[in-house]
Swiss-Prot record:
This is ABC transporter G family member 32. The lineage of its organism: Eukaryota, Viridiplantae, Streptophyta, Embryophyta, Tracheophyta. GO terms for molecular function: ABC-type transporter activity; ATP binding; ATP hydrolysis activity. Keywords: ATP-binding, Cell membrane, Membrane, Nucleotide-binding, Repeat, Transmembrane, Transmembrane helix, Transport. Belongs to the ABC transporter superfamily. ABCG family. PDR (TC 3.A.1.205) subfamily.
Length: 1420
């Protein structure tokens, strides 16, 4: 037996030796290959451990996942082991990584700003700024602006192999510093000082290729998936130095006879080779960032459902982690992420920085203590100065030396951000025998320079970096990461993929074009079309013109699609992903098939059905012409989009381009009627070439060869061309096609240049008061000043603001409690979940929730994502728009009634939605005016508003513009406080707050929570949802409602001193881990109640709570609170709203007036556009009104009216859509708060347009009427003004109406576009009413533009009895007779026309108001 066992063992050993020998032979064979081949092959083991030789580029997705699982199996816990293996491999052959040391010396960044009301974007300020900017550019004036110092001569060193944390309160200069170091500062800032990488100036290297700046803004293409986004970024950036490093590593390992780890070898080769469709590095980065679960999900936007905001933030980081940059500047990358995810990402950055000797600076808002401990160095900034730069573990010693100590239970990062703040500093003063005096940032910076760490830093900066130690691969001197031909291929594949993803848009455009073609076919039906007279020819000419306008207009969709993508393109450009032409060339080439399909469809549907010349060659020629026109159109509107760069501006530019091209195209106004000073415009109009080419192609054909008669030998076609001043040579067809193709090339070149050299429009600056600017300068310079006693009292005590304790306010309120029992909430199961096998019809989101909120008690509502925190708050506040609610809610013992509850409660939404063009004080006055009782006079309202501003610390910002979130105006933290203030001025008894500290830095969160505590101390009832709060924030609450995933309650009760009650409760449960000393109770609570812990312990925390004494006590409390006291009275109000409908309307109109006045991108651009159009059309149509000798001259006058109405109207409608969309979104919050009814808001939006449209129509009518020399009588001018006014008005109301009936302005613009085409077709200009087929005449009367043209022409010419020569050149009739016989216009119908244009205004405005009232596109 022993012998057999011995034999078995020897066989086993021999088998093992054979395997090892086989592996050695396999590696030996691999090592014998040439280096080029060797680094492209590796040994891969499958799931059972069977080795095989593979091509690195041929790894399948399943093999990649298996490899990653083996390499980084425990990435969630600690990636250190993986990086240690990487480092060990390089150390084994003594191969060093390229290191980069970044230095900045005396870095000064300054800007020039306007102060106070001069900074508000009003129309006068907008005009003055434009004029000043123009004069400044030509060095005529400097302009009166105030200097604002952003970075104040700072110096420092960022060393490789050390992870650096950048901290500082808002507006301290963190982002500016990171942008400056990355070489990405805007040209509008004045910069001085020196920045070097390894001793080399930024001008000597390509900084964006050497370093990478991760922006706060998450700009991505919505239609791409997460994986596609990362793959594209990785392929564009290339592999950098990694390929050369791999070659050297392979060479040294071969010489040393080292056999590398198989899996690591494949991974590193994949990393260095790049160019693969799905590279391992992308899979690895997705795994590290937690994006592997949504890898194939679209990024999405407001139109496309996609990944969450936190996932987008991680994707922004991942885009640059897949690249080869050795220096990373990461700006607030944790926004929207929970602390565990942030900790995981920072841990990865720490180990990669240490192992690969990278240079990394990361700016974070609220790093948890665990995350803070991962950093090696800290840079602390305040007011543009560096307060401290050095090792993390020495920073507290520095502040201790100045008399400021961090409390034991305080997060160090929070302490650092607060200790430099004037309002927070006092609480950290720790020298009892010395009175506290405020130490401004300037003094801290001065003290640091005298501190040993500061002296050491200064000494290092004195010695220049020795360039001999610069690794040859460290700094990038090439513009792009891969060859330009490869970048072109990458872009081609990317845009081809985007076209597939956007297939719906292209199909929708095609269907839209097909429908319009079918309508056109039935309007210009060959059975009603003849070839007998010049008037017949005019109808054919009109059909050709309409076809070309439709094809031209079809390219307009490029404007919104391009403008939406521009931020991403600018980001790619600035990061040197690819040259601009590598994007524009594929976009041009890929548009060719769509042009072919759409042009072919139009020609195929309309050519023979309309009755054009039957010769097939002419059919093909029309197709070629329309294809060339479509290509030119796409190029033209890409130019307009890249030049406009903002949706409203680009749309206006696009409309203007259409106007110029169409007006000077030779159809609206004939060539011989265009004044000599505008004839150059005719020759450069692309539509002119298309018009002439299409005309000769048709009218020199067989159908038009009969003699025109009237003493001429010319054919009918030739006579028509001469009559309309069109060219008559056959060669003009080829001139037209060549010109259109030439314009296509020109426009695409201009598009490329604009994309390469233009930058996004600058943001509106926040409003800075003179006092604020002066105080900022004092702090910066370190001037000493003592905090006044009142201010000290107000802000001392950090979060627990003592000043407002038991303090009364101007307006009294009634303290109320809110109790609720057995709250259940159900929603219908989505179809997607049903398809996954869920059988129930309803999904329960809240399960028997019972609790109470009391006056003077601050309650926290806490739970993991998906626990139902916001859902519970929405249910209690009555904000849910769908689902089924069960349970009882009582207000101080009385059943809750939503009509009255909205009057005594406030709801602070997480989104911070406000009207962007109001100032802070105006927003508060508006809320107070509509929500306070009607018997409170305006003086008391103002006093109360100012009291609330003081309470929430907004007094210094009272004149600041609110702006749009993430775009301009107030910072995130300031917007949070404004949201709270807007609800507080309603004098509510109960306030709900949804995530009031999300997205804020520690200091800002402390300010907000201090605000909340101040409000509670006035005796109000407040409940806040909160997500993983810091110790300070968590322990500022009095009570806690803690929910677990699934909508069940697991704790409801007091927190206690230092959370002792909470800790006592959970530690009493058997098996729950005890809290560690100094640990955050909120984080501990979430950890020990996680679903994994429930599974480990085999318990249900919800069941434990339901059986606890605490739950029983809560039920008893709710039993008491659910019954009114003897003296209590139920709250009742005589009306639903505090103000009458008229008062609501006046208040809404007041707000809209301010909003319009301060929105120059909407209002001023409209006026500017109107002035330009009136001057342009006035000079083109010079004295047209007095020329009435021929039918063509009358047609020219009609053309000028048609062009103005259509283009000013469509521009107004398009521009109004985004404005109304934003205001409607704000109104959802305001109406839910019971501020006003839908109708006063809607009619205020309607009425505010009256003066602006009146100004527009007066500007246009006065200028154009005078220049065109229409009959100068008061009656005729007033009729002209009347029709222009109401025509522009109904277009504007139509744009507003389409927005009101659709979810957003993008959908509205899609819905509106076909109607513009139909209004154009049936306006009576291209085909007179009498020539419209009988089956379509009803639509002529339903067309507002037709009534406008009717009214304008009849009011000017309907009573004119002078003779006019007809198009045959012989016969004459009176002007009014011509209008009646040819156009079908009668002077008797002038009054009807006037009534109809007014009726359309009324109709569109009423539909708008009804839609605002009836439709709610906000889903809660």
């Amino acid at each position: 037996m022993w012998n057999s066992a011995e034999n078995a063992f020897s066989r086993s050993t021999s088998f093992k030796d054979e395997i090892e020998d086989e592996e050695e032979l396999r590696w030996a064979a691999l090592q014998r290959l040439p280096t080029y081949s060797r680094i492209r092959r590796g040994i891969f083991r499958d799931m059972v451990g069977e080795p095989k030789e593979i091509q690195i580029g041929n790894l399948e997705a399943s093999e990649q996942r298996l490899l990653l699982d083996r390499l980084v199996n425990s990435v969630e816990n600690d990636p250190e082991q993986f990086f240690a293996r990487v480092r060990k491999r390089f150390d084994a052959v003594d191969l060093k990584f390229p290191k980069i040391e970044v230095r900045f010396q005396n870095l000064m960044v300054e800007s020039f700003v306007h102060v106070g009301s001069r900074a508000l974007p009003t129309i006068p300020n907008f005009i003055i700024n434009m004029a000043e900017g123009l004069l400044r550019n030509i060095h005529v004036i400097g302009g009166k602006r105030n200097k604002l110092t952003i970075l104040d001569g700072i110096s420092g060193v960022i060393r490789p192999s050390r992870l650096t944390l950048l901290l500082g309160p808002p507006s301290s200069g963190k982002t500016t510093l990171l942008l400056a170091l990355a070489g990405r500062l805007g040209t509008n800032l004045q910069t001085s000082g020196k920045i070097t990488y390894n001793g080399y100036d930024l001008k000597e290297i390509i900084a964006p290729r050497t370093s990478a700046y991760v922006s706060q803004q998450d700009w991505h293409v919505a239609e791409m998936t997460v994986r596609q986004t990362l793959e594209f970024a990785g392929r564009c950036q290339g592999v950098g130095f990694k390929y050369d490093m791999l070659l050297e590593l392979a060479r040294r390992e071969k010489l040393a006879g080292i056999v590398p780890d198989e899996d690591l070898d494949i991974f590193m080769k994949s990393l260095a080779l790049g160019g693969m469709e799905t590279s391992l590095v992308v899979e690895y980065v997705m795994k590290i960032l937690g994006l592997d679960t949504c890898a194939d999900t679209l990024v999405g936007d407001e139109m496309i459902k996609g990944i969450s905001g936190g996932q987008k933030k991680r994707l922004t980081t991942g885009e640059l982690l897949v690249g080869p940059a050795r220096v990373l500047f990461m700006d607030e990358i944790s926004n929207g992420l929970d602390s565990s995810t942030t900790h995981q990402i920072i841990m990865y950055m720490r180990h990669s920085t240490h192992a690969l000797e990278g240079t990394t600076v990361i700016s974070l808002l609220q790093p948890s203590p665990e995350t803070y401990e991962l950093f090696d160095d800290v840079i602390l900034m305040s007011e543009g100065q560096i307060i401290y730069q050095g090792p993390r573990d020495e920073v507290l010693d520095f502040f201790s030396s100045l008399g400021f100590t961090c409390p034991d239970r305080k997060n160090v990062a929070d302490f650092l951000q607060e200790v430099t703040s004037k309002k927070d500093q006092q609480q950290y003063w720790s020298v009892p025998f010395r009175p506290y005096r405020y130490v401004p940032p300037g003094k801290f910076a001065e003290a640091f320079r005298s501190y040993p760490t500061g002296k050491k830093l200064a000494k290092k900066l004195e010695v220049p970096f020795d360039k001999r130690f610069n690794h040859s691969a460290a700094l990038s001197t090439s513009q792009y990461g891969v060859k330009k031909s490869e970048l072109l291929k990458i872009n081609f594949a990317w845009q081809k993929q985007l076209m597939k993803q956007n297939a719906f848009i292209y199909v929708f455009k095609f269907v839209q074009l097909l429908l319009v073609a079918l309508i056109t076919m039935t309007v210009f039906c060959r059975t009603t079309m003849h070839h007998n007279t010049i008037d017949d020819g005019n109808i054919y000419l009109g059909s050709l013109y309409f076809s070309m306008v439709i094809i031209l207009f079809n390219g307009f969709t490029e404007v919104p699609m391009l403008v939406a993508k521009l931020p991403v393109l600018y980001k790619h450009r600035d990061l040197h992903f690819y040259p601009s032409w590598a994007y524009t060339l594929p976009s041009w080439l890929l548009s060719i098939p769509t042009s072919i399909i759409e042009s072919a469809t139009w020609v195929a549907v309309t050519y023979y059905t309309i009755g054009y010349d039957p010769l097939f060659s002419r059919f093909l020629q029309q197709f070629l012409l329309y294809f060339s026109l479509h290509q030119m159109s796409l190029g033209l509107f890409r130019v307009m989009g890249s030049l406009g760069r903002h949706m409203i501006v680009a749309n206006t530019f696009g409309s203007f381009a259409m106007l110029v091209v169409m007006t000077l195209g030779g159809f609206i106004i004939s060539r011989d009627s265009i004044p000599s000073w505008w004839i150059w415009g005719y020759w450069i109009s692309p539509l002119m070439y298309a018009q002439n080419a299409a005309s000769v192609n048709e009218f020199l054909g067989h159908n038009w060869q009969k003699t025109a008669g009237n003493h001429t030998s010319d054919s009918l076609g030739l006579a028509l061309l001469k009559e309309r001043s069109l060219f008559s040579g056959n060669y003009w067809y080829w001139i037209g096609v060549a010109a259109l193709l030439g314009y296509t090339v020109l426009f695409n070149i201009l598009f490329t240049l604009f994309l390469a050299h233009l930058n996004p429009w600058g943001k509106f600056q926040a409003v800075v008061s003179r006092e604020e600017l002066d105080e900022r300068e004092k702090k910066r310079k370190g001037d000493e000043f003592v905090v006044e006693l009142r201010e000290y009292l107000q802000h001392s005590g950090s979060i627990h603001g003592k000043y407002f304790k038991n303090r009364g306010m101007v307006l009294p309120f009634q303290p109320l409690s809110l109790s609720f029992s057995n709250i259940n909430y159900y929603v219908d199961v989505p179809l997607g979940l049903k398809e996954q096998g869920i059988l129930e019809d309803r999904l329960q989101l809240l399960v028997n929730i019972t609790g109470a909120f009391r006056p003077g008690v601050l309650t926290a509502l806490v739970g993991v994502s998906g626990a139902g925190k916001t859902t519970l708050m929405d249910v209690l506040a009555g904000r849910k728009t769908g689902g089924t609610i069960e349970g009882d809610v009582y207000i101080s013992g009385f059943p809750k009634r939503q009509e009255t509850f909205a009057r005594i409660s406030g709801y602070c939404e997480q989104n911070d939605v406000h009207s962007p063009c109001l100032t802070v004080v105006e927003s508060l006055l508006f809320s107070a005016c509509l929500r306070l009782p009607a018997d409170i006079d305006s003086e008391t309202q103002r006093a109360f508003v100012h009291e609330v501003m003081e309470l929430v610390e907004l007094t210094s910002l009272s004149g600041a513009l609110v702006g749009l979130p993430g775009v301009d105006g107030l910072s995130t933290e300031q917007r949070k406080r404004l949201t709270i203030a807007v609800e507080l001025v309603a004098n509510p008894s109960i306030v709900f707050m949804d995530e009031p500290t999300s997205g804020l830095d520690a200091r800002a969160a402390a300010i907000v929570m201090r605000t909340v505590r101040n409000i509670v101390n006035t005796g109000r009832t407040i409940v806040c949802t909160i997500h993983q709060p810091s110790i300070d924030i968590f322990e500022s609450f009095d009570e806690l409602l803690f929910m677990k995933r699934g909508g069940e309650l697991i704790y409801a009760g007091p927190l206690g001193q230092k959370s002792c009650e909470l800790i006592k409760y959970f530690e009493s449960i058997e098996g729950v881990q005890k809290i560690k000393p100094g640990h955050n109770p909120a984080a501990w609570m979430l950890d020990v109640t996680a679903s994994t812990e429930e599974h480990r312990l085999g318990v249900d925390f919800a069941e434990i709570y339901r059986n606890s004494n605490l739950c029983q006590r809560n039920k008893e409390l709710i039993e008491v609170l659910s019954k009114p006291s003897n003296i209590a009275k139920e709250i009742e109000f005589p009306t639903r709203y505090s103000q009458s409908l008229y008062s609501q309307f006046v208040a809404c109109l007041w707000k809209q007036n301010l909003s319009y006045w301060r929105n120059p991108q909407y209002t001023a651009v409209r006026f500017f556009y109107t002035v330009v159009i009136s001057l342009m059309l006035g000079t083109i149509c010079w004295k047209f009104g007095s020329k009435r000798d021929t039918q063509q001259q009358l047609f020219n006058a009609m053309g000028s009216m048609y062009a103005a109405v259509l283009f000013i109207g469509i521009t107004n409608a398009t521009a109004a859509q985004p404005v109304v969309s934003i205001e409607r979104f704000v109104s959802y919050r305001e109406r839910a708060a019971g501020m006003y009814s839908a109708l006063p808001f809607a009619f205020a939006q309607v009425f505010i347009e009256f003066p602006y449209v009146l100004a527009q129509s007066t500007i246009y009518s006065t200028i154009f009427y005078a220049m065109a020399a229409f009959e100068w009588s008061a009656v005729k001018f007033l009729w002209y003004l009347f029709f222009m006014y109401f025509s522009i008005m109904y277009f504007t109301f139509y744009g507003m109406m389409t927005t009101a009936i659709t979810p957003n302005h993008n959908v509205a613009s899609i819905i509106a576009a076909p109607f513009y085409m139909l209004w154009n077709l049936f306006s009576g200009f291209m085909i007179p009413y009498k020539r419209i087929p009988l089956w379509w005449r009803w639509y002529y009367w339903a067309n507002p533009v037709a009534w406008t043209l009717y009214g304008l022409l009849v009011s000017q010419y309907g009573d004119d009895e002078r003779s006019v020569k007809l198009s045959d050149g012989i016969h004459q009739v009176m002007v009014k007779q011509l209008l009646e016989d040819v156009m079908g216009y009668k002077h008797d119908f002038l009054g009807v026309s006037a009534i109809m244009v007014v009726a359309f205004c009324v109709f569109f405005s009423l539909v708008f108001a009804f839609a605002i009232k009836a439709f709610n596109f906000q889903r809660r």
